[in-house]
Amino acid sequence: KIDQKFLYNIKKYISTKNKDIKFIPIQNMSRKQVFDTLRGAKLYIDFGTFPGPERMPREAVSLYCNIITSKKGSAANNVDVPIPRENKFDLTDENVPKVGQLMLQMIENYEDYVSQGDQYREKVYDQIESFDQRIANIFDIK
């Protein structure tokens, strides 16, 4: 569950710096709407708790979004969410300006940051390819 107070404070901070930035919650959307939203985004933020590797950040990074997460659950480790530690935050009031500044930088200087997701993207693509191979091995499909 996302920390609504933290998200509110982030939105408030961002609105004082750049009124053109839109926050689009990914909820109650069809698969196509999710795809279209992420494909058009420069940044995906997820301040929820990660019980394990999560689908949404994986889809976002696959569609070349920059990523910022909380440090809750498996997002804290570099195995499930392999992005720079500087892009993972404790959701404290003190971190609102830090998160806000990084968000602005990632949006305004998108090209400078998008390569930070290369390792994560490769991991996602490898998992997709190896999944098919594992299924073939399980069922002895040649």
Stretch-by-stretch model annotation:
Residues 119-138:
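Non-catalytic membrane-proximal stalk/linker segments that position and tether the catalytic domains
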